[in-house]
């Protein structure tokens, strides 16, 4: 029996044992958008709402096997890249994706956990910049991640356009620079494409939320898998994350809150 095409997205990211971020958040996001979710796990993390205790990375050959198994069977409409953990993993992912240049790729350069734990080295930063930025349809760094990729501080909202242009110059086709780490009662995110700048402003929410970056990049990938233009996918993703934050809850004993993805389903 044949069935109609189901929009499908792929997340290539780490597993969060606490369920708040990583592939767990990505797959819930895909489901909220009505997109079939597939995954390739780059690393297993032992973490919870208090912090990251340990990381076990996947062998690169097995990671490639996961990605190729998905791409060889499903009509994947977009891929989202999250925690890549090591330069070897970044290189392996880049090697597979370079053979599929038509596949939209959303790169979330996960380098620091919400708790402050570092998830990447300088060698990984260099690998992301050299190998994966040129493959990215969209890169979605927060301020610390953009600073790591560029090697300089981004001290204010006024500095965001220059930083976004530098990331585009490094190879990304579009940049969504998230300004949540800057001070102020309002959070400003900047989308820079070949057509120019588009700003998004939201009221800052109180609390330390876990998995916002993962969910945002996954939501953009879901929108692209549904065939939406990039700007529309980004706008819908930002709205989705804001609604999921409003419905967020604290499932553990730590301070981190997690997003309620299903409550925010479009």
Where do the language-model regions lie?
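Short pre-catalytic strand/loop immediately N-terminal to key active-site residues, enriched for Gly-Thr
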Residues: 12-18, 197-210
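Acidic-glycine-rich active-site phosphate/pyrophosphate-binding loop
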Residues: 1-6, 22, 185-199
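Conserved N-terminal subdomain of the carbohydrate kinase-like
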Residues: 2-11, 27-114, 265
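Short, small-residue alpha-helix embedded
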Residues: 29, 147-148, 207-230
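Charged C-terminal helix
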Residues: 6, 54-57, 231-266
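Conserved phosphate/ATP/ADP-binding segment of small-molecule kinases
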Residues: 122-196
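Phosphate-handling active-site elements
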Residues: 33-38, 198, 223-238
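Nucleotide and nucleotide-moiety/phosphate-recognizing core
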Residues: 72, 77, 87-104, 173, ...
């Amino acid at each position: 029996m044949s069935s109609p095409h189901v929009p499908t997205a792929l997340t290539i990211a780490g597993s969060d044992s606490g369920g708040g971020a990583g592939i767990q958040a990505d797959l819930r996001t895909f489901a909220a958008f009505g997109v079939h979710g597939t995954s390739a796990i780059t690393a297993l993390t032992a973490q919870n709402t208090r912090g990251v205790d340990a990381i076990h990375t996947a062998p690169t050959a097995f990671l490639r096997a996961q990605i190729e198994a998905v791409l060889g069977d499903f009509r994947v409409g977009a891929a989202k890249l999250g925690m890549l953990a090591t330069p070897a993993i970044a290189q392996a992912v880049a090697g597979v994706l370079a053979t599929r240049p038509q596949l939209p790729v959303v790169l979330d350069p996960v380098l620091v956990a919400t708790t402050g734990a570092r998830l990447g080295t300088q060698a990984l930063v260099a690998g992301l910049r050299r190998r994966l930025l040129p493959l990215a349809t969209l890169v979605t760094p927060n301020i610390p991640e953009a600073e790591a990729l560029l090697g300089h501080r981004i001290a204010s909202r006024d500095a965001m356009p220059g930083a976004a242009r530098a990331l585009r110059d490094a190879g990304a086709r579009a940049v969504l620079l998230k300004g949540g780490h800057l001070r102020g009662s309002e959070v400003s995110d900047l989308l820079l494409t070949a057509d120019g700048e588009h700003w998004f402003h939201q009221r800052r929410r109180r609390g330390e939320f876990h998995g916002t970056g993962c969910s945002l990049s996954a939501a953009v990938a879901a929108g692209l898998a549904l065939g939406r233009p990039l700007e529309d996918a980004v706008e819908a993703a930002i709205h989705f994350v804001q609604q999921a934050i409003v419905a967020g809850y604290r499932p553990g004993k730590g301070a981190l809150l997690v997003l309620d993805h299903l409550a925010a389903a479009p």
